[in-house]
């Protein structure tokens, strides 16, 4: 019979995954919003290249992405060595490195969701606000942002779910250290290598599925609620 009682190591893996997913979502949101805006509204040489680079983690094997992160941000890498010597910041084999890996893997999903929302905005609404004297920042805050909020929510939740399930890039970049970098997927993988670990792996698998479904369903419901509120405000106006 499957028991839902988790061992301390399993709780560590679960809480670490939640922390990594939340942090990766938070640190990805500002740059994702900026990049999505640039890709949706700006025309410049190299735009296609930027779009390709943003979506590259979706195409590359996650292990390759993790290895590139290790080459760049490892203690001997050009960026990692500089961060370590200058600020004492180390990402490789730390939980913060797992945040970086999850953020990189979830970034394209967030950018795409926000970009589609920006492209769907009727530019005439923004132009009308501008003719009424609103500055560009005010137009963005009062007109554009409320309209693209469902896309932001959807992108953030997708990035969170991706962070919860990230495995290949994480284990390549930060390894499998109990209590430090052993996230939920890595814990499941580890348990499957141990005789008799199938029951614990099944528990964690069920939890991972439940959390992912909860995030996706919650995202859909929240996006619908925001859309209804926006339509209601438009009707009042």
Task: Please name every model-derived segment.
Residues 26, 111-114, 118, 122, ...:
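Transmembrane alpha-helices
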Residues 46, 108, 112-126, 130-131, ...:
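C-terminal transmembrane helix and the adjacent membrane-cytosol boundary/short C-terminal tail
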Residues 1-26, 38-44, 84-88, 190-199:
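Periplasmic/extracellular loop-to-transmembrane helix junction in inner-membrane transport proteins
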Residues 74-75, 152-190:
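Non-cytoplasmic
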Residues 21, 25-33, 37, 63, ...:
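Hydrophobic positions within alpha-helical transmembrane segments of bacterial inner-membrane proteins
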Residues 2-3, 66-103, 173-178:
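Membrane-interfacial helix termini and adjacent extracytoplasmic/periplasmic loops
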Residues 1-9, 173-213, 218, 237:
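Interhelical loop and adjacent transmembrane-helix boundary motif
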